[in-house]
Design a protein with these regions (language model features):
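Short polybasic amphipathic segments
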Residues: 43-46, 50, 117-119, 176-178
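Aromatic-lined ligand-binding clefts that engage carbohydrates, nucleic acids, or primary amines
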Residues: 97-99, 104-122, 158-162
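Soluble extramembrane domains flanking the early transmembrane region of eukaryotic membrane proteins
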Residues: 89-92, 101-105, 112, 128, ...
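Solvent-exposed beta-strand/loop surfaces of large extracellular or lumenal domains
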Residues: 62-73, 80, 124-144
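An acidic-aromatic loop/edge-strand motif
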Residues: 141-188
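Intrinsic-disorder/low-complexity, polar/charged segments enriched in Ser/Thr/Lys/Arg/Asp/Glu/Gln
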Residues: 39, 90-96, 103-107, 143-147, ...
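Extended carbohydrate-recognition surfaces in non-catalytic/accessory domains of CAZymes
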Residues: 1-7, 15-102
Length: 188
């Protein structure tokens, strides 16, 4: 009787201590692995049928394309549910961000974009995957997830010139993830 009661109390105490330790150190609701990561899925400007550079936008030259707002992940091709638009071709995605006032080193994970792109931060070409080309004749597919690092402060513009002529999907179908460089690299 008495030994069983003592054993029961010891098991309860160790269990409480163990679960408290798990709560503080391994709680999926407390320690969010994505803390510090911002998924960039909404408020993207999209220009269908045009590959626009930062300079084009500064000059107000959209090459005849009109701007519409899109949410990344809502559709999986350029048609954007418009029956009069093709699912393939090209388009430019633009996102304006307000970042920390002091210059900070950021990293952005760009998931696979179908099927080629050039990526600019403000006016600087940061990276490229495949070759969007100026037409479907000099386009080269290059589909892969990449991480790019850059420094920025305050107002920041992300721009992706994209083209797809060959895949089932087209354009940006998954949102990029942005955060301070150490946070993004630690997550991956």
């Amino acid at each position: 009787g008495k030994v069983l009661q003592i054993t029961f109390c010891v098991v309860i105490l160790f269990s409480c201590a163990f679960f408290t330790l798990l709560y503080w150190n391994d709680n999926k609701y407390k320690n969010d692995p994505n803390e510090g990561i911002r998924y960039l899925y909404d408020n993207w400007e999209f220009y269908y049928g045009a590959l626009l550079t930062p300079q084009d936008l500064k000059n107000g030259d959209t090459k005849g394309a009109y701007m519409e707002y899109v949410t990344i992940g809502e559709v999986n091709n350029y048609s954007n549910h418009n029956p009069y638009r093709g699912a393939h071709g090209c388009g430019t995605y633009v996102l304006h961000l307000k970042l920390a006032a002091e210059k900070t080193r950021y990293a952005i994970e760009i998931p696979e974009i179908y099927s080629a792109y050039r990526f600019y931060v403000n006016d600087e070409l940061i990276g490229q995957c495949g070759e969007p080309g100026e037409s479907d004749r000099n386009y080269q597919e290059g589909i892969q997830t990449k991480i790019y690092s850059f420094e920025a402060a305050g107002e920041c513009t992300l721009l992706l010139e994209t083209r797809d002529e060959s895949h089932y999907y087209s354009g940006m179908t998954y949102p990029p993830a942005l955060g301070e460089e150490s946070v993004v690299l630690h997550r991956v």
